[in-house]
Amino acid sequence: MDQPLQAQQGELNWRLSAHPITLLFFLGFRTSALLMYLFGVLFIKNFVLVFILTLLLLSADFYYLKNIAGRRLVGLRWWNEVNTATGDSHWVFESSDPATRTISATDKRFFWLSLYVTPALWIGLAVLAIVRLSSVIWLSLVAIALVLTITNTVAFSRCDRFSQASTYANRAFGGNIVNNLAGGLLGRLFK
């Protein structure tokens, strides 16, 4: 008798997610903006309404990814701070402590795959809008989508690199302190 295959962590199966509701909303916002852009005019005959709904879905996707999905699915968060005195702007990155939080391989895979695929799809739609030259307003909507999706992609990529670098630095720094303390104590005992 054949045994049914068991789903393993890391597969693209939302049921394996540690946070399935967060994951479904994340994927829902990501795909709904694309679907509204592609098929909205077929079902809603009002161009302005399709434009506004797509813009609202893009904004909801940006907010949800930045503030909720990134933190819950991969333990990363970012924001931009502006020094009011100088007007200088800098990005702040935050990551969960790997010792206290385990990230699901399925959540991680869905998150990063969707994070990189969505801007690629919008780039394809931008090329299509340029080639068609049917309406500049559609190109402006795609440009807004590209700004929002690429901003999140760049920010989370930097946040992940920052998180990995600080984890390695903490391990190296923490290991050296323990080695120095242990070496110093043992050296004093056997003097």
UniProtKB/Swiss-Prot annotation:
One cellular component (GO) term of this entry: Golgi membrane
Main location: Golgi
Subcellular compartments: Golgi apparatus membrane
Membrane-related topology note: Multi-pass membrane protein
A biological process from GO: vesicle-mediated transport
TM region positions: 16-36, 38-58, 110-130, 136-156
Keyword terms: Golgi apparatus, Membrane, Transmembrane, Transmembrane helix
Pfam family, one: DUF846
Family: Belongs to the TVP23 family.
Function summary: Golgi membrane protein involved in vesicular trafficking.
Name this polypeptide is given: Golgi apparatus membrane protein tvp23
Native organism: Aspergillus fumigatus (strain ATCC MYA-4609 / CBS 101355 / FGSC A1100 / Af293)
